[in-house]
Amino acid sequence: MPADLQSIADPRLILLAWAAGLALVAGVVSLSRIVGPGFSWLTAGVSALVGLPAVFAEGEWWARAALLALVLGALWARNKALAGVVFLVAGTAYLVEAILFSGALSAVTATLALGGVTGEMVLGHWYLVDPRLPRLALRNLALVGIGGLAAEAGLQVALGVGVTGGALAFWVLVVTSIALMTAVVGALRYPAYSGVMAATGLSYLALLTTLGAVFVGRALVAGLGPFDLT
């Protein structure tokens, strides 16, 4: 954890972690060969867009390497094995940049939470087109998101976030996010098409609350703006 706690609430870190999570999801899904290259193109594009601010920051060469890898992975998306490996390299490069910026724990928890929730939401749209696809990947991404949110909560407790005062907003957001993603897992057990529809809709809400939980928890620790531990 960095000595300057304000770095863990810096928007650049959150964007780097988000980009890392998306790129890693693109790599894993590409290697699993469950959907076509369209998912890789979309996820790589969103990852590149989210990570773009870091690319133009001074000295962030890992982020630039990640962007290059995303472009190459998108170009090779029809070769799923090769593209999957390149996307994993991109995600790792973004994660390294985030770790250098704010420390390993802060970067990894945000990457897991944002990557799992966003990846489940995006991949869910392919299941809406073809609900016969195996749902294991969706369930696994949802579980990764839940694990990341739980780790994020543990990190904030370790950094001194309590359960009263201004910290209440964080706990409402993180508990709501975990509840929504748990509901996603439950909806995916329902074999009908409506189960995938419900899971995808719930993941949209979970993404909003997850973003809020990640930022508010860190802002509490850093003492930024109106956020206060008391």
Predicted segment positions?
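Cytosolic, membrane-interface loops and tails of multi-pass inner-membrane proteins
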Residues: W126-L138
